[in-house]
């Protein structure tokens, strides 16, 4: 029995030796997590109609904004590279990382207090198309999420960052699965009694479990938490690198908030349609793009630190080609099989056929940028590994302004339905990635991309031919694909 526990422990805390093995573990666990995530969405669609789900999804907008600024802005671009840089000195590592975590958490408390006090004032400006009763419900649920979910989720994500910096990915990948399970269970057992409070309760419990399950990572790390805030070199580096990335996230969150605002003018259920279509498109992006990006950062940072520029260049070319090889066929599948996919994932009792069709069309326009969206996360990590967070920031600001401009034109000038927001997103994402690619090429210098362009062309042509043949050889008379 002791031998069994020892093997289990070694398996859970084993360190990965390559990007491929790390990305594989992350991808498998993200697939499982996303599977439960879509069971969550299907469960919600079975208990609540799309108008009611508007309230639920809109309640996450403000908590998500705070979370993205503090965690996505801090963790992905700065925390992991700094952790790796100081991990050879245990004392300095513990002081520096503890200071960073404590500083961010104090900032979180400040945001929570301010937002809870003034939420009723500015929420009507975010959701102007909602009734007063609907806005009051959004405010109530937003406060519960700010107070009950956010602290656990923020601390849990710092543990995730520590695990990834140590190249220990299994436990950090299990945590989101349990988060989704908690929401599903709470909805099934309590939705009929406490309505939308049931999934909100599940979110809070899930966030707590998300934190607790990752606490063992502290034991198996050279980092020892200290309750201190100390002016260290690492803290200054952290904020110097974080500020551009945080501004990128702020602009992106403004973009997401404007999307919510615009959908409130498009009728009841529009935000649910937009939200579900976007998250279905994010399934392959998360499994492939985000997983690969997360797994690549520690290795890219290490190569840059050791001056292995040629290996860095080779990994960039090979990684982009591998990502295209996986995502271009998936993009085609999502476009041609959009309606069955939406019905499969979201076809609950209260999710009617009109909602299915509108979500499917929106999904197809989101999917056009799927390969570029997947590569985006890897390209930004390349810049972060080179200790450059400013370039992705400037490019993101430009692409987000483009997205907002197109969205406003499509909705208020041409009066297009909700799928127009997906066209705006895809256009801006493609532009973003193309500019990132060009600037990264210049930054690395002397990189041969001929094989990348040649193989990508082959993949694209083969995918197009296979998709067209499959589409027109389907059962005669069917028009729902």
Where are each of the predicted segments found?
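Membrane-embedded alpha-helical bundles of multi-pass transporters/translocases
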Residues: 2-481
């Amino acid at each position: 029995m002791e031998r069994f526990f020892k093997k289990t422990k070694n398996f859970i805390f084993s360190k990965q030796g390559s990007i491929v093995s790390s990305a594989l573990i992350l991808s498998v666990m993200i697939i499982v997590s996303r599977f439960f995530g879509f069971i969550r969405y299907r469960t919600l669609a079975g208990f609540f109609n799309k108008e009611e789900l508007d309230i639920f999804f809109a309640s996450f907008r403000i908590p998500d904004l705070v979370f993205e600024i503090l965690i996505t802005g801090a963790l992905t671009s700065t925390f992991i590279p700094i952790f790796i840089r100081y991990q050879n000195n245990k004392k300095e590592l513990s002081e520096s990382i503890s200071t960073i975590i404590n500083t961010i958490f104090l900032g979180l408390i400040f945001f929570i207090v301010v937002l809870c006090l003034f939420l009723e004032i500015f929420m009507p400006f975010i959701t102007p198309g909602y009734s007063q009763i609907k806005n009051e419900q959004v405010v109530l649920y937003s406060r519960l999420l700010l107070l009950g979910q956010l602290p656990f989720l923020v601390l849990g994500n710092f543990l995730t960052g520590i695990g990834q910096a140590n190249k220990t990915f299994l436990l950090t990948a299990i945590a989101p699965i349990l988060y989704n399970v908690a929401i599903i269970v709470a909805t099934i057992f309590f939705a009929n009694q406490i309505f939308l409070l049931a999934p909100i309760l599940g979110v809070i419990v899930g966030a707590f479990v998300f934190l607790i399950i990752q606490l063992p990572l502290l034991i198996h790390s050279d980092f020892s938490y200290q309750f201190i805030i100390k002016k260290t070199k690492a803290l200054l580096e952290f904020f110097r690198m974080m500020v551009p990335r945080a501004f990128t996230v702020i602009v992106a969150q403004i973009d997401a908030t404007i999307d919510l605002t615009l959908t409130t003018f498009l009728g009841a259920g529009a935000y649910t349609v937009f939200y579900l279509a976007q998250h279905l498109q994010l399934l392959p992006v998360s499994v492939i793009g985000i997983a690969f990006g997360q797994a690549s950062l520690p290795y890219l940072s290490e190569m840059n630190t050791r001056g292995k520029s040629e290996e860095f260049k080779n990994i960039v070319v090979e990684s982009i080609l591998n990502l295209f090889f996986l995502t271009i066929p998936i993009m085609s599948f999502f476009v041609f099989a959009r309606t069955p996919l939406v019905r499969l994932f979201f076809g609950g009792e209260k999710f009617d056929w009109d909602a299915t069709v509108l979500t499917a069309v929106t999904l197809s326009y989101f999917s056009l940028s799927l390969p570029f969206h997947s590569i985006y996360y890897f390209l930004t990590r390349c810049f972060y590994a080179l200790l450059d967070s400013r370039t992705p920031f400037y490019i993101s600001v430009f692409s987000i302004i483009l997205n907002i401009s197109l969205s406003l034109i499509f909705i208020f000038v041409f009066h297009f339905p909700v799928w127009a927001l997906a066209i705006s997103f895809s256009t801006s994402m493609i532009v973003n990635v193309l500019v990132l690619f060009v600037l990264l090429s210049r930054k690395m210098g002397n990189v041969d991309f001929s094989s990348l362009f040649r193989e990508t062309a082959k993949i694209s042509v083969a995918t197009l031919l296979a998709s067209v043949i499959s589409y027109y050889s389907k059962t005669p008379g069917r028009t729902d694909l």
